Curated annotation (Swiss-Prot):
Belongs to the SHMT family. CDD domains: SHMT (cd00378). GO terms for biological process: glycine biosynthetic process from serine; tetrahydrofolate interconversion. The lineage of its organism: Bacteria, Pseudomonadati, Pseudomonadota, Alphaproteobacteria, Hyphomicrobiales. The gene is glyA. The keyword Amino-acid biosynthesis applies. (6S)-5,6,7,8-tetrahydrofolate binds at residues 125, 129-131. GO terms for cellular component: cytosol. Catalyzes the reversible interconversion of serine and glycine with tetrahydrofolate (THF) serving as the one-carbon carrier. This reaction serves as the major source of one-carbon groups required for the biosynthesis of purines, thymidylate, methionine, and other important biomolecules. Also exhibits THF-independent aldolase activity toward beta-hydroxyamino acids, producing glycine and aldehydes, via a retro-aldol mechanism. This is Serine hydroxymethyltransferase. It comes from Allorhizobium ampelinum (strain ATCC BAA-846 / DSM 112012 / S4) (Agrobacterium vitis (strain S4)).
């Protein structure tokens, strides 16, 4: 009995101090550093509680009301709430909330709509696409005939005429619109016109901008697309996971079958419960304000960096992210990411269109505002952050080495700690 009592009551700090210590260190990092990775965000306490709940104990293969296990009546409530809230949030008729990740949601669409060897079109990785949009190192690029489209070299904007021409030539079965590092508004209507002309399905991967769509800061892909996929973290501010949305009942059945039993077994019910919580939060009026502030902050950061002597790919941003071309500062993405990290500013190196550097080096970094906006940062803070970034990069240019400029980085680090200290997170932890 004593062993059972300990199993159910002994806290993590006692059971596994190594993991507890790692979590505590990560909490400290998140509290004290500025998070600018565009695909990351900060979830609410309510989302954390749902994801860390006893729903993790339950197996629930199948869908609500049609499970292959007994005892699912309460996890069914959670999944039904997630589905209904997702449908309301994006104004659609069908939602599958079971995909465990963004890659799996996209794979499910491929499984439902394509056969190995079929042709599809997607944004080239070097132009801001995603691995699952046809990269040769990804399953999507190995199993299918991929025709990539990209941006123009002169302005780094999507070349829609070239997309149309390529579609007419290659007759894809599926066209994917959406990306991970494109900072401008997507013309869903034009993509649908191209898809209709060649008899293709239009799939929109809005993983990065779903929160902006929900917050009325970016046009919705509906009614133009046949299917939209999105992760549930990033700008949507939920737990890590994926989701598939459509208005077509026949396609919805195919997507459901593709997710289960096609790709996954038992869904992660604790994550689905957390998705439901996040969708509920996104349905509140204050989420509209949040999404608007994300975009305002991105514009403020972008403009500050330009004033500091940096180039922004495509000349600016209309959403939550920007690609920063570092070549004017004589820096690489690899070197800049490391230097900014030492100064407690977290970002990721990222290739820019037509990048002369290798993928592990790059000529750019990608920056995003969702996490900082969640903390409460507004334009004034992002102007300050932009100036700190320029300060680090100018110091790096003077040092001209991987070691960077320790004096400048230490000074900026102190300023970052002062800034983040004014915007506490998870005070109960």
């Amino acid at each position: 009995m004593a062993n059972t009592d300990a199993f159910f009551s002994r806290p993590l700090a006692e059971t596994d101090p190594d993991i507890f210590g790692a979590i505590e260190k990560e909490l400290g990092r998140q509290r004290h550093e500025i998070e600018l990775i565009a695909s990351e965000n900060i979830v609410s306490r309510a989302v954390l509680e749902a994801q860390g709940s006893i729903m993790t104990n339950k197996y629930a293969e199948g869908y609500p009301g049609k499970r292959y296990y007994g005892g699912c009546q309460f996890v069914d409530i959670a999944e039904e709430l997630a589905i209904e809230r997702a449908k309301k949030l994006f104004g659609v008729n069908f939602a599958n909330v079971q995909p465990n990740s963004g890659s799996q949601m996209n794979q499910a669409v491929f499984l439902a709509l394509l056969q190995p060897g079929d042709t599809f079109m997607g944004l080239d990785l070097n132009s801001g696409g995603h691995l699952t949009h046809g990269s040769p190192v990804n399953m999507s690029g190995k199993w299918f005939n991929v025709v990539s489209y990209g941006v123009r070299q002169d302005d780094n904007l999507l070349d829609m005429d070239a997309v149309a021409e390529s579609a007419r030539k290659h007759k894809p079965k599926l066209i994917i619109a959406g990306g991970t590092a494109y900072s401008r508004i997507w013309d869903w209507k034009r993509f649908r016109e191209i898809a209709d002309e060649v008899g293709a399905y239009l799939m929109v991967d809005m993983a990065h901008i779903a929160g902006l769509v929900a917050g009325n800061q970016h046009p919705s892909p509906f009614p133009h697309c046949h299917v939209a996929t999105t992760t549930t973290h990033k700008s949507l501010r939920g737990p890590r996971g994926g989701m598939i949305l459509t208005n077509d009942e026949d396609l919805a059945k195919k997507f459901n079958s593709a997710v289960f039993p096609g790709l996954q077994g038992g869904p992660l019910m604790h994550v689905i419960a957390a998705k439901a919580v996040a969708f509920g939060e996104a349905l509140q009026p204050e989420f509209q304000d949040y999404a608007a502030q994300v975009v305002k902050n991105a514009k403020a950061l972008s403009e500050t960096l330009v004033k500091g002597g940096l180039d922004i790919v495509s000349g600016g941003t209309d959403n939550h992210l920007m690609l920063v071309d570092l070549r004017k500062k004589n820096a690489t993405g690899k070197r800049a990411e490391a230097a900014l990290g030492r100064a407690y500013v977290t970002c990721n190196k990222n290739g820019i269109p037509f990048d002369p550097e290798k993928p592990f080096v790059t000529s750019g970094v990608r920056l995003g505002t969702p996490a900082g906006t969640t903390r409460g940062f507004k334009e004034a803070e992002f102007i300050e952050i932009g100036n700190l970034i320029v300060e680090v990069l100018d110091g790096l240019k003077v040092a001209n080495s991987d070691e960077g400029n320790s004096a400048v980085e230490a000074s900026v680090r102190d300023k970052v700690i002062g800034l983040t200290g004014r915007f506490p997170m998870y005070p109960y932890l």
